[in-house]
C-alpha cells in the first residue's frame, strides 16, 4: 500500500504534502483557532480539507490559498464547502495578504498546516504583512516552533526567533506526533499561535537594518559580535549601548538587536534600493 496516497490523492513531495488525519488533533487545532462568523479567515494550503471542513462549518465564508491545481479543483466541487469558499490557486510565498485584508475590510486570521519545505521563508513573507493580520495559527515542524519561541542563550535562538518576536507574540499551542499524518513525516510537529503586537515593544526605525544585523550576526554565530558585526559597530559603540562585544549572536536579546538597528539607522542609514 502506498502511504503517500490519502483520500485518493497522491501526496506530492515537491509541495511538501503531509495530510492531517487525526481527529483529536484536528479538533484541538480548530478549538485553538476558535473561528467566528464574520471574521476574515484565510487558510494556507488546505490540502484535503482536514482543517477546512471543521473551520468552514463554523463560517459563512472562508478564503483558501492552494498551489496544487488538483486540490484547488477538488475544493471547488466540495459538497458543502464549495459555495462558502473563495479559492486562490496561487503560491502563498508571493501572495499579497495586504491587498486581501483591504478587500475584506478587516485584518486577516491566517491558519494552516504549512508545507515544511517552505515554512521558514513563508513566515518571513507573512511578517511583512503583520499590519494586515490579526493572528496566525500554524502547524509546523516542531524544531521550527522551538526556534520561533526560543530566547537568548539557547541553541534554538536565531534570526527567526528575533524577527518573529519583533513582530509577534509567539505562543506554542500543541505538539503533534508523525502518526497524525499521511504519509507520516520524519519529524515531530507542533502548532503555534502568532499574534502581531498591537504596540511594538521594541520599535525599529528601519526593519531592513534589523534584518541585516541579525543575518550577519547569526551567519557567524560562533564568532563574538566584535568580529561578526565589526564592520557595522566599533567596540566603543557596542560598549556605549551596554552590549558586551565578547558576546555571541545567541546571547543578544531582541531588545538589544532593536537598539543596535536603531543606532545604525540613525548613523549609517541604508540607501533606498
Swiss-Prot record:
Recorded family membership: Belongs to the class I-like SAM-binding methyltransferase superfamily. rRNA adenine N(6)-methyltransferase family. RsmA subfamily.
The protein, known as: Ribosomal RNA small subunit methyltransferase A
Function: Specifically dimethylates two adjacent adenosines (A1518 and A1519) in the loop of a conserved hairpin near the 3'-end of 16S rRNA in the 30S particle. May play a critical role in biogenesis of 30S subunits. Also has a DNA glycosylase/AP lyase activity that removes C mispaired with oxidized T from DNA, and may play a role in protection of DNA against oxidative stress.
One Gene Ontology term from the biological process aspect of the record: rRNA methylation
Superkingdom of origin organism: Bacteria
Compartments in which it is found: Cytoplasm
GO CC, alphabetical: cytosol
Top enzyme category: transferase
Disruption phenotype: Inactivation leads to kasugamycin resistance. Cells lacking this gene show cold-sensitivity phenotype, altered ribosome profiles, and small subunit rRNA-processing defects.
Amino acid at each position: 500500500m502506498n502511504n503517500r496516497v490519502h483520500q485518493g490523492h497522491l501526496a506530492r513531495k515537491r509541495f511538501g504534502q503531509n495530510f492531517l488525519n487525526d481527529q483529536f488533533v484536528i479538533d484541538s487545532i480548530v478549538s485553538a483557532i476558535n473561528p467566528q462568523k464574520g471574521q476574515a479567515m484565510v487558510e494556507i494550503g488546505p490540502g484535503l480539507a482536514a482543517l477546512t471542513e471543521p473551520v468552514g462549518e463554523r463560517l459563512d465564508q472562508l478564503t483558501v490559498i492552494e498551489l496544487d491545481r488538483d486540490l484547488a479543483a477538488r475544493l471547488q466541487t466540495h459538497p458543502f464547502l464549495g459555495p462558502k469558499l473563495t479559492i486562490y490557486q496561487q503560491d502563498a510565498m508571493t501572495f499579497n495578504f495586504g491587498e486581501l485584508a483591504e478587500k475584506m475590510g478587516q485584518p486577516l486570521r491566517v491558519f494552516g498546516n504549512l508545507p515544511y519545505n517552505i515554512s521558514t521563508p513563508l513566515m518571513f513573507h507573512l511578517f511583512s504583512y503583520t499590519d494586515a493580520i490579526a493572528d496566525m495559527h500554524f502547524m509546523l515542524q516542531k524544531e521550527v516552533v522551538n526556534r520561533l519561541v526560543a530566547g537568548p542563550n539557547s541553541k534554538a535562538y536565531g534570526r527567526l526567533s528575533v524577527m518573529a518576536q519583533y513582530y509577534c507574540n509567539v505562543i506554542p499551542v500543541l505538539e503533534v506526533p508523525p502518526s497524525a499524518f499521511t504519509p507520516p513525516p520524519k519529524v515531530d510537529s507542533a502548532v503555534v499561535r502568532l499574534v502581531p503586537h498591537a504596540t511594538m515593544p521594541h520599535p525599529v526605525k528601519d526593519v531592513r537594518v534589523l534584518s541585516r544585523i541579525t543575518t550577519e550576526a547569526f551567519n557567524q554565530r560562533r564568532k563574538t559580535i566584535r568580529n561578526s558585526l565589526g564592520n557595522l559597530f566599533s567596540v566603543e559603540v557596542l560598549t556605549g549601548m551596554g552590549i558586551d562585544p565578547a558576546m555571541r549572536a545567541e546571547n543578544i536579546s531582541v531588545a538589544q538587536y532593536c537598539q543596535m538597528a536603531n543606532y545604525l539607522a540613525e548613523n549609517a542609514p541604508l540607501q533606498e534600493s
